[in-house]
Amino acid sequence: SRGLGDVYKRQKEAPFILSTSTHIGYPEGNEKLRQTAVFLSGYIREMTGIETEVTADTGSSNSIRLVLDRTAVSSPEGYRLKVGKRDITITGSSEAGIFYGIQTLRKSLPVTGQKEISFPAVQILDEPEYRYRGMHLDVGRHFFSTDFIKKYIDIIALHNLNTFHWHLTDDQGWRIEIKKYPKLTEIGSKRKESLLNDGPGKFDGKPYGGFYTQEEVKDIIEYAAERYILSLIHISEPTRQAEI
């Protein structure tokens, strides 16, 4: 095991100042890391209003560099984050590790407006203790929009989790389109009313329903995969099938 001094070290150096001339560099030809750089640029713009250019890495100053080094960290999902006056370097042994590194940088951005955005000089080594790190979303009992699910996945990504457990069916509703069996959604996605609170036999008397088309499911799975999140599809069988 490592002590805090092994994974987090403050450096005696001036901080890195984020500005409109800062650019984000990725390994030339690596499309996955180009997309990761685009994500980071978007996070910075959303939280600070600062526009940063995404380019192939040239090693120039005033840059945030994404570096792929298969030997950098023992864990395939680990990363090293080094902040200096000249640049910020996020080094991972995989594209996923680098993505998790930018989430740490993202969480270092101010949540309120500041005249100057700076990152203190520091070195961080971070790697997960558990291979499976997931969140569960039950849409069988309560239907959520695709927009909500994407926001949910964004939160999963922010916390360096790697699995989206998507609970798509239960007694209260069947939520995934199966073209060979259309009645699963024509009938099974709807219920005549919902239980109120925890009281037995108390219902609201309001029809309720909803389901996801196959294209919507594919879109969500792709959205998660772009953020290095595996979608674990949960269909309850043979029990909990009152909806069919």
What kind of region is each of these model predictions?
Residues S60-S61, Q172-G173, R240:
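Short secondary-structure capping/turn micro-motifs that flank functional sites
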